[in-house]
Design a protein with these regions (language model features):
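Class I SAM-dependent methyltransferase SAM/SAH-binding core
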Residues: 54, 60-109
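A conserved beta-strand element that flanks and buttresses the S-adenosyl-L-methionine
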Residues: 121
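Short alpha-helix
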Residues: 175-191
């Protein structure tokens, strides 16, 4: 497996991150993106039944067990961190893990043959990679008209960027959340690319609700967010984005 210096740093970071059971402080904020993850799951469920699926940068398998319930024909999880893959197997358990192909590989230079998968999805992985290399590989391993479904952080909110500067040890030094111009990489390889933004007011007021599923406050804020995100000005204040498309 060929590795760049950036790849080696990412391996070290994620091996250390997942080599213990500590919960990251930042995890408490992710409830502000509950509607995004719900939409992400819905997109996968609508597209994966009886399909060959790739979890791109599967990490510790946060999505794999869930996607198994959506009846894919075959599901593969690939990650550059052996520590993460082993932890994923432990978390998911032996009975379910035997239904998943776990592959240790470099997402910027995959060993799969072209056209291996009908759907490729990922959560918070692309901003750890070189966009041009990763998206070219995703396109290569997809069948014609194969689908992509990704959620990624944005690097356009000044308050979030300030927090990132204050907490450099919480992320790898090579991370680069998406900027507006970065979406051109998607459009170079995929058609019908759609972006849906999340996490503005739901993040600002996250102290005012506990469980987003049962919160009228969260529902109000998330609906208001979607109205605001129709205007380009407010999109830069989003925390994250859902990206869908199909192979050219």
């Amino acid at each position: 497996m060929q590795l760049s210096e950036e790849n080696k740093r990412e391996i070290k970071f994620h091996d250390e991150l997942h080599g213990n059971d500590k919960v990251r402080f930042e995890n408490r904020f992710y409830k502000a993106l509950a509607n995004m993850f719900s939409d992400f799951d819905s997109q996968i469920e609508q597209n994966c039944k009886n399909k060959r699926i790739l979890d791109f940068g599967c990490g510790i398998g946060n999505n794999l067990e869930k996607v198994l319930k959506f009846s894919p024909k075959e599901i593969t999880g690939v990650d550059i961190s052996k520590v993460s893959l082993e932890k994923a197997k432990r978390i998911i358990g032996d009975d379910k893990s035997k239904n998943i192909n776990f592959i240790h590989d470099n997402c910027e230079k995959l060993s799969f043959v072209s056209g291996s998968f009908e759907v490729v999805y990922g959560s918070g992985i692309l901003h750890h990679l070189k966009y041009d290399l990763a998206l070219k590989e995703i396109s290569r391993v997809l069948t014609n008209n194969g689908k992509i479904i990704f959620v990624e952080p944005l690097g356009t909110n000044p308050v979030i960027n300030f927090y990132r500067r204050l907490t450099p040890k919480s992320r790898s030094i090579d991370e680069h959340p998406f900027l507006e111009n970065d979406f051109s990489y998607f459009r170079a390889h995929f058609k019908n690319v759609k972006l849906k933004y999340y996490g503005f007011l739901t993040l600002i007021f996250f102290f005012f609700y506990k469980d987003p599923k049962n919160s009228l406050i969260f529902n109000f804020l998330s609906n208001l967010d979607q109205k605001l995100f129709k205007y380009k000005f407010f999109q830069k204040f989003a925390w994250s984005v859902l990206i869908t498309g199909a192979k050219n």
